[in-house]
Amino acid sequence: MVFLMPSFAFSTNESSSRLLLYKTIEVGDLEKAKVLLTGTDINYQDHLGYTPLYKAVFYNRQDFVEYFFELGANVNLSDIEGLSPLHVAALEDLPRMIKTLKDEGANIEAKDDYGYTPLHLAADQGSFNAAQNLVFAGANVNNRSKWGGTPLHASVANKNLDLIRLLMNSGAKLGLKDRLGRTSLHWVAEKGDLPIAKFLLLKGVSINLPDNDGETALHEAAKWGHLQMAQLFITHGADINAKGGDGRAPIHIAIAHGNIEIVDLLKKYGASF
């Protein structure tokens, strides 16, 4: 999962006073913002769905956020991609902002258009403090995106062991699969991060679970040429002759991708052609 931050592009249809307000939030001039907000709707959304509160969260303007709530700002209004202010705080790793938004009624399980919760995005961006605050506030660590990915999948994909530990200690399930049938071990086998693989195996992840194509984590290691990963999997009981849906075992995958060292390793352990 790769997330692109909001660009905050402006339409020529936006009023000059609205654009000035946005700039005032960016530079942190609260008194000027108060003047500009006189007689306006604090919950007005521009063509991208942004509100003054949304912008204040992005720029980490705590004083603006608190003032906007005094004016009746809606904490859960999302932009045109479904991102709420809490999503933005998670992306930017703003634990104090997260607490403020949560105290004002922010939906901790809100999903954007891709099904990502704030915790998904914190995990994806490596925002440890934000993730910790969300978990402590009761965020569901096993929530799935539209692709079936969990926050654990995201933290594994980004090789963040601290976040993985946090999620595991908070009840993250190792065996959950994304829409392609891939577990967290499939993901780490692709990325080639040995310490994370060892940690997941220590926690009891099932090593021979197949994805939707019938391929195991060892198939992935063979595909990407991760020799030490393949060795680790074999010593932990990986089935060296497991066949995918197309009938290919890890050794066939290694041959197809030119990973000769892995071919030799599999032959050493008795892999059949």
Task: Explain the meaning of each model-derived region.
Residues 29-37, 61-69, 94-102, 127-135, ...:
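Ankyrin repeat structural motif
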Residues 145-158, 178:
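Solenoidal tandem-repeat scaffolds enriched in leucines and small polar residues
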Residues 23-28, 55-61, 88-94, 121-127, ...:
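Ankyrin repeat A-helix N-terminal signature
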Residues 8-23, 170, 203, 236, ...:
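Ankyrin-repeat-protein effector appendages
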Residues 8-38, 47, 58, 70:
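Intrinsically disordered, low-complexity regulatory segments in ankyrin-centric signaling systems
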